[in-house]
Structure formats: structure tokens, C-alpha cells
């Protein structure tokens, strides 16, 4: 209901799967996106739910019947109504507790290798939120603290005590998020290597490693850079600057791999998600 380009739509997916055919801009991807959001409360195409509502609408709804489950979402700007088997779930965490994992593969997966760090952080966060129950909480807590701290940095009459309080919150949640990302990549990296060997050239060696934006105590780093942050009006250090180092035979895949090799790496990264989950 009022999701993307659909006012309403009903779709029964056979157990053996389905192939969706249609012209450009008819909403094929939006159908898959709706399934993804129903299961994970996340879209792989946008960071916020707001753009998922149809043009001119503030709310949207999705309902789905799955093996042993009936899920329903009514998403509004105030508070989403989340139900499983007709019973309301008090928060997003309880809604997701018994949901199904999702691996999203799309035409833009090449951006995992070619584009900037934002695409790779989204990859980590989409997977991490399904892999560990504390990941999503750490991520959203960090984002809230970051938004408030940046707001304070931009205002001339800021309260220094309040700024320090949010700096501590940012460091607390950021340190937890960094730890979870590092653990995630330690587990994920071997799956990526194996996936690449199974579909690419066996003699080639692909490696993916987590690169934190800052080493050492995050709170100390933030305090040391506060004058610079005030000058720029935003926080320069923290997990929102993290990245992944992707190499092929020890060299940067973005700079030295062919487009075919880059595409194989991107597919391997998605197949590794499936193996891990």
C-alpha cells in the first residue's frame, strides 16, 4: 500500500522462485525491495524509510505470508505498527528477532569495488544488522549521537558540556560499532576468498579487510580534533569514515583489477553474505 510506485499490489511467489519481467521503470526492483523491507526493516537502496512512501504520501504498508509467519508493517513518520501473526511487536528488535535473512544482489553491486567508501559501509551495515543482534542497535545509536554532535558543532552558541556529553556517547557507540565490524570482517573474509575461487580464476587471490578510520581511543581522538570539527561543522573521525580494503593479488582491486575481475569480486562479496548467514 502506497509503496514506491504502487498504490496497491498483490503478488504470490511460488516456492520454486520467480522471474519478474517488465519494461524499465515499471517497479520490478520495488517489488523485491518491499519483500526486503518486510523482512529486515531496511532497504538496500536508501538509508531512511521515508523515500519508500509513494509520491505525495507520508506512510506505506506491506503485508506478507511466509512459512509459519504472517508479517505486516504500517510505517508512519510517528511510529511504525509492526505485527507478526497479528500480534504487535513493541519495537524493531523484537520484530526482527524471528525474521528471515536477506542477501540483496543488484546491478549496482560493482560500486562495492569501484565507488567510494559509503557503498562498502552500507554493505557492512546491511549484513552486520542481520549477523549480530547488537549491531543494528550500535549503528543507530551511533548515528543519533553523530547527528546531534554535528548539530552542536555548527552552532556558535553551543554548550561545551553538552558537546562533550555527546562526544562521549559517540565514542561509546562508535567503539562498539568498530569492534563489531572488525569481528564481522574476520568471519566474512574467508567466505569471500572461497567464493571468488569458486567462480573466478583459481590462481588469483582476493582479500577484503576492515579499515577503521582511526586507531586508538576514539574519545581521545574526538577531543583532540574538536577545534577542527568546529571549523568544518561536522565530525571528521569515527566509524562513519570506515572503509574496506579490497585487493586482488596484493594490489588495489579498484585501481588495478579489470572490470570483469571487479564484478567477480562484487559477486563473491554477496555470495559470502549468504554463506555467513
Where is each model-derived feature located?
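Conserved NTPase motor "head" modules and their coupling/switch loops across ABC/AAA+ ATPases, GTPases
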Residues: 1-23, 36-37, 49, 65, ...
Amino acid at each position: 500500500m502506497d509503496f514506491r510506485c504502487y498504490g496497491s499490489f498483490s503478488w504470490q511467489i511460488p516456492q520454486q522462485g520467480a522471474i519478474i519481467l517488465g519494461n524499465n521503470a515499471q517497479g520490478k526492483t520495488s517489488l523485491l525491495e518491499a519483500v526486503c523491507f518486510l523482512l529486515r526493516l531496511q532497504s538496500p537502496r536508501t538509508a531512511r524509510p521515508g523515500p519508500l512512501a509513494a509520491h505525495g504520501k507520508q506512510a506505506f504498508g506491506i503485508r506478507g505470508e511466509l512459512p509459519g509467519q504472517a508479517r505486516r508493517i504500517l510505517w508512519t513518520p510517528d511510529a511504525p505498527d509492526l505485527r507478526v501473526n497479528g500480534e504487535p511487536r513493541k519495537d524493531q528488535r523484537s520484530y526482527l528477532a524471528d525474521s528471515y535473512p536477506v542477501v540483496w544482489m543488484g546491478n549496482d553491486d560493482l560500486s562495492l569495488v569501484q565507488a567510494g567508501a559509503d557503498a562498502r559501509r552500507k554493505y557492512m551495515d546491511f549484513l552486520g544488522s542481520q549477523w549480530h543482534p547488537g549491531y543494528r542497535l550500535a549503528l543507530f545509536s551511533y548515528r543519533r549521537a553523530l547527528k546531534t554532535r554535528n548539530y552542536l558543532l555548527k552552532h556558535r552558541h553551543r554548550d561545551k558540556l553538552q558537546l562533550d556529553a555527546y562526544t562521549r556517547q559517540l565514542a561509546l557507540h562508535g567503539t562498539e560499532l568498530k569492534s563489531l565490524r572488525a569481528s564481522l570482517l574476520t568471519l566474512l573474509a574467508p567466505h569471500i576468498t572461497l567464493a571468488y575461487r569458486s567462480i573466478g580464476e583459481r590462481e588469483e587471490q582476493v582479500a577484503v579487510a576492515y579499515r577503521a578510520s582511526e586507531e586508538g581511543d576514539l574519545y581521545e581522538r574526538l577531543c583532540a580534533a574538536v577545534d577542527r570539527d568546529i571549523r568544518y561543522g561536522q565530525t571528521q573521525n569515527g566509524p562513519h569514515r570506515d572503509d574496506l580494503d579490497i585487493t586482488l593479488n596484493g594490489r588495489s582491486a579498484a585501481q588495478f583489477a579489470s572490470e570483469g575481475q571487479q564484478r567477480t569480486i562484487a559477486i563473491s562479496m554477496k555470495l559470502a553474505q549468504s554463506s555467513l548467514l
